[in-house]
């Protein structure tokens, strides 16, 4: 009986301990669970802010990548268009067609540009030869001053016409006019900005028009000096333009392929195109100087001296053309 009671007591104690442990276990399990729930509730607003911020950052990064991709694609597309335009220009020049910078075939190099001017210049030269022959006959026949004036005025108007034709042709192809491709090789050796130097022409005429009065000599000397100064200013302007253009083109040199280099290349070429646009202005100023010099020379001289001056100018350029013909026809070993 004592053993049974002892076992009962022991069992009761164990049961009680087990219950206590179970309660303690449950309590241990419940307490931490309640604490975690409170922590989750307090951290939830912060977690939502972080998530929103992360989502915003991801969206901003995605948009940035899309913008960069679109920018690179645009640059590559522009580079391809530029290369295609250059190919079109080269192809057109081989076929004799001038294409404007916008890609529109607004001028035909052979139809409305250089070749047309070459034909017009040939007709102009033929007409000038007729006028000069008429003037020479009148001078040799000792025609009256009034008759000489009519012929001289006609020749001066004819010079005005060639300057007008050059201005029109320069709008189609300024390089053709500036380079003197419409002139003979010997004439091109003495070419300055698409024509003759007024100052050099005046030097040539002074020796051909003697005797001259002191007032005429002074007038021609002043005209020669002012022409020389204007020519020097235009020459310096052309040199500055050429240097600026060279610097612009050199600035675009470098390894190709990256979007930055493509953008830089296109920007530099656009700047160079803008600077080339000033060539027409230089040519126009040079022709204005030539035209004004001829008219001022006529006002300084008597009508008979002006007639002799026009004959001397024509004979000088005729000899240059004849020299070119002889040079081209020379025997070659």
From Swiss-Prot:
From which source organism is this entry?
Oryza sativa subsp. japonica
Gene3D superfamilies assigned: 1.20.5.170
Q: What Pfam family does this protein match (any one)?
A: bZIP_1
Q: Which keywords accompany this UniProt record?
A: DNA-binding, Nucleus, Plant defense, Transcription, Transcription regulation
Report the GO terms under cellular component: nucleus
- Give the protein name, as stated in the record: Transcription factor TGA2.2
**Is Transcription included in the keywords of this UniProt record?**
yes
Protein's gene: TGA2.2
Skewed-composition ranges (Basic and acidic residues) = 37-48
Region Disordered, residue ranges: 1-48
Task: Report quaternary structure and partners.
Answer: Interacts with NPR1/NH1. Interacts with NPR3/NH3.
